[in-house]
Swiss-Prot record:
<dbReference type="InterPro" id="IPR036771">
    <property type="entry name" value="ATPsynth_dsu/esu_N"/>
</dbReference>
<keyword id="KW-1003">Cell membrane</keyword>
<dbReference type="GO" id="GO:0046933">
    <property type="term" value="F:proton-transporting ATP synthase activity, rotational mechanism"/>
</dbReference>
<dbReference type="InterPro" id="IPR001469">
    <property type="entry name" value="ATP_synth_F1_dsu/esu"/>
</dbReference>
<dbReference type="GO" id="GO:0045259">
    <property type="term" value="C:proton-transporting ATP synthase complex"/>
</dbReference>
<comment type="subunit">
    <text>F-type ATPases have 2 components, CF(1) - the catalytic core - and CF(0) - the membrane proton channel. CF(1) has five subunits: alpha(3), beta(3), gamma(1), delta(1), epsilon(1). CF(0) has three main subunits: a, b and c.</text>
</comment>
<dbReference type="InterPro" id="IPR020546">
    <property type="entry name" value="ATP_synth_F1_dsu/esu_N"/>
</dbReference>
<keyword id="KW-0472">Membrane</keyword>
<dbReference type="InterPro" id="IPR036794">
    <property type="entry name" value="ATP_F1_dsu/esu_C_sf"/>
</dbReference>
<keyword id="KW-0066">ATP synthesis</keyword>
<comment type="function">
    <text>Produces ATP from ADP in the presence of a proton gradient across the membrane.</text>
</comment>
<comment type="similarity">
    <text>Belongs to the ATPase epsilon chain family.</text>
</comment>
<dbReference type="GO" id="GO:0005886">
    <property type="term" value="C:plasma membrane"/>
</dbReference>
<protein>
    <recommendedName>
        <fullName>ATP synthase epsilon chain</fullName>
    </recommendedName>
</protein>
<keyword id="KW-0406">Ion transport</keyword>
<keyword id="KW-0139">CF(1)</keyword>
<dbReference type="GO" id="GO:0005524">
    <property type="term" value="F:ATP binding"/>
</dbReference>
Amino acid sequence: MKTIRVSVVTPDGPVYEGDVEMVSVKAKSGELGILPGHIPLVAPLEISAARLKKDGKTSYVAVSGGFLEVRPDKVTILAQAAERAEDIDVLRAKAAKERAERRLQSQQDDIDFKRAELALKRAMNRLNVAGMK
């Protein structure tokens, strides 16, 4: 079966590099499935799991926003943060989730609710992806 090259890159460096049969991501416009030979495309990404399918197996990468660039022979995910499912520290992700929930529940005026909501989404995404490995 044909494959397409995938790179998941963050400001800290590469997270994933390999050839897969299909890439599935959640863009702002909805769910996208990319196969080899896909038309060129650039799309902003949601905080979600990128699913990388090869040989009947699926690998998961927690992606915290960013952009997807598709060319017929290559997919690049430029993310603010990304972690492979097997690399996620579940205890750290749970602690981040609890911190974000406490910030959202506090009644202080100086709390930036949008930032706290994003932190909660990122932590929940990491926990969900860690459970997929």
